[in-house]
Curated annotation (Swiss-Prot):
Membrane-spanning intervals of the chain: 3-23, 65-85
Organism: Methanocaldococcus jannaschii (strain ATCC 43067 / DSM 2661 / JAL-1 / JCM 10045 / NBRC 100440)
UniProt keyword terms in alphabetical order: Cell membrane, Membrane, Toxin-antitoxin system, Transmembrane, Transmembrane helix
Protein name according to UniProt: Putative antitoxin VapB5
One Gene Ontology term, aspect cellular component: plasma membrane
Primary site of residence: membrane
Membrane topology: Multi-pass membrane protein
Role summary: Possibly the antitoxin component of a type II toxin-antitoxin (TA) system. Its cognate toxin is VapC5 (Potential).
UniProt keyword annotation of Membrane present: yes
Keyword Transmembrane: yes
Length: 107
């Protein structure tokens, strides 16, 4: 890879990692709040269903949240970093994408 590609790539990966951690923290907080406010039983009239929780979805148990949350945050962060870098230096976004595509096709 050439020099102009390395610097935004490293900063994008670092910010993406922080965005993933923040997304998991937010999702755990929101799901914890929902679990604490919802009723704890599906069927209160049936005693044997007393300990069944209504909301059992969390990023650890729901595969779609495990996959989508980091993927969305990473892609949004990568796009915003590329846009900011290209606005800082004109025509950089085109050069960056051209360098990455030529690296992927030749290497």
């Amino acid at each position: 890879m050439q020099g102009p590609v390395i610097i935004p790539l490293i900063s994008t990966l670092g910010l993406s990692f922080l965005a993933i951690l923040l997304a998991y923290k937010i999702s755990f907080s929101v799901i914890g709040f929902i679990n604490s406010t919802l009723p704890t039983t599906l069927f209160p009239s049936k005693p044997y269903m007393l300990f069944v929780k209504i909301s059992t979805i969390s990023p650890l148990t729901c595969p779609s949240l495990i996959i989508l949350t980091p993927a969305l945050t990473w892609s949004l962060t990568a796009l915003s970093m590329a846009y900011l870098y290209s606005s800082y230096k004109p025509n950089t976004f085109f050069t960056l994408s051209k360098n990455v595509s030529s690296f992927l096709t030749t290497g």
